[in-house]
Amino acid sequence: MTMEEMKNEADATSMVSMTLYAVMYPVFNELESVNLSAAQTLRAAFKKAEKENPGLTQDIIMKILEKKNVEINFTESLLRMAADDVEEYMIDRPEREFQDLNERARALKQILSKIPDEINDRVRFLQTIKDIASAIKELLDTVNNVFKKYQYQNRRALEHQKKEFVKHSKSFSDTLKTYFKDGKAINVFASANRLIHQTNLILQTFKTVA
């Protein structure tokens, strides 16, 4: 297996773990105000289990929903919840460029998470698409600003993640074009989730090497 194939496999594996931070982390955060120790224990246990068995959290939630006979569009629900900041991904360096990176990523994720509310109103959805395009450009501009100002030993990892983000941005654009032909919103939701995931990975990569 080549290095690129290994990275792609790792990305795909972590994608199924979106449920952990999009669905369960907010639950743990709420629990902290009631029982801090229990919340920390549960968070650590879920993180460990998810790391060893990627997708486990999603499987558990799907089984619970199935047992309770709750019918929801999980892909859509995940997208609605995926805009929140995730501490593990947020860059904690104080320099303006890094804080800008956090803010640009947050802005893009928030716009993407609104797609389910906008998609059935053509005028509003077209404006949302324009906002997403602007947010993507602003995020990439900020990434380039960081590249210019700071030198990294592990620049290849950063360049790779930037290319992955651009690739998924183009894929999202292609999905939108197809949607206007076939009307299948679920494909737009899934593509938006992947783009949010890539946005988080950009933050994670910078946080790791910064």
UniProtKB/Swiss-Prot annotation:
UniProt membrane topology term: Peripheral membrane protein
Keywords associated with the record: Angiogenesis, Apoptosis, Cell membrane, Cytoplasm, Golgi apparatus, Membrane
Subcellular location as annotated: Cytoplasm; Golgi apparatus membrane; Cell membrane
InterPro entries according to UniProt: PDC10_dimerisation_sf (IPR046409), PDCD10 (IPR009652), PDCD10_N (IPR048288)
Superkingdom classification of source: Eukaryota
UniProt KW Membrane keyword: yes
Any one of the GO CC terms: FAR/SIN/STRIPAK complex
GO biological process: angiogenesis; apoptotic process; blood vessel development; blood vessel morphogenesis; chordate embryonic development; Golgi reassembly; heart development; heart morphogenesis
GO molecular function list: protein kinase binding
Main location as per UniProt: cytoplasm
Keyword Coiled coil: no
Subunit structure: Interacts (via C-terminus) with CCM2. Interacts (via N-terminus) with STK25 and STK26.
Function statement: Promotes cell proliferation. Modulates apoptotic pathways. Increases mitogen-activated protein kinase activity. Important for cell migration, and for normal structure and assembly of the Golgi complex. Important for KDR/VEGFR2 signaling. Required for normal angiogenesis, vasculogenesis and hematopoiesis during embryonic development. Required for normal cardiovascular development. Promotes cell proliferation. Modulates apoptotic pathways. Increases mitogen-activated protein kinase activity and STK26 activity.
Family designation: Belongs to the PDCD10 family.
Identification of the protein by name: Programmed cell death protein 10-A
Taxonomic source organism: Danio rerio (Zebrafish)
High-level lineage: Eukaryota, Metazoa, Chordata, Craniata, Vertebrata
Gene: pdcd10a
